[in-house]
Amino acid sequence: MSDSVSIRAAVPEDAAALLAIYAPYVEHTAITFEYDVPSLSEFRGRIEKTLTRYPYLVAEIDGKPVGYAYAGPLKDRRAYDYCVELSIYVDETCRKHGVGRLLYDGLENCLGEMGITNLYACIGYPDIEDEYLTKNSVGFHEHMGYEIIGSFRKCGYKFKRSYSMVWMEKIIGDHLEDQPAMRPFPEVRGMLGY
């Protein structure tokens, strides 16, 4: 399936299609600790805000969005400019077909051009897998070169159950004494074909 997948930058008009991918994660899983599906206008605002500084990519098959991934600030302090937190959501009918890998490869390429050095993923983690949460996301990230660097025990409560959370990290750039300034996504997207 990954041969027929194209990756492009999101636009605010993608909000309805991407929200349709995200909503089942909110309603039926503990993959996100969000309880309520955001409104269309709120979700569109999230896309717009992200794109002012970071990449927000969409995977399509035959012009239909089947997944998305984006980067955001790790923390809101300038010293963290070279670190980002990633999020990824793939339509449940397209999982395990290479869509996530293509999205993350695209993000990593963008973020490397921006001067980002550290990638982080905050992942819900069950002590015992159940119908709401498995360890598949951790496995995906390990396959993509991430490693677990920390955990918060039973910090999320959803569906009358407590879930842990792990932080995973991947270093993609050199840490220099005179680190070049981070370049926002709008400055590099044209040269990357987005």
Located regions from the model:
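Glycine-rich phosphate/pyrophosphate-binding loop shared by adenosine-nucleotide-utilizing enzymes
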Residues: 5, 64-68, 163
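A short beta-loop-alpha structural element at the N-terminal edge
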Residues: 6-18
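Conserved GNAT-fold acetyl-CoA-binding loop/helix
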Residues: 19-46
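Acetyl-CoA-dependent GNAT
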Residues: 37-93, 105, 110, 114, ...
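Conserved catalytic-core motifs of GNAT/GCN5-like acyltransferases
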Residues: 70, 122-124, 138, 142-162, ...
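Conserved acetyl-CoA-binding loop-helix of GNAT-fold acetyltransferases
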Residues: 96-112, 135-139
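Conserved GNAT acetyl-CoA-binding A-motif
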Residues: 111-133
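Short, cationic low-complexity segments
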Residues: 182-194
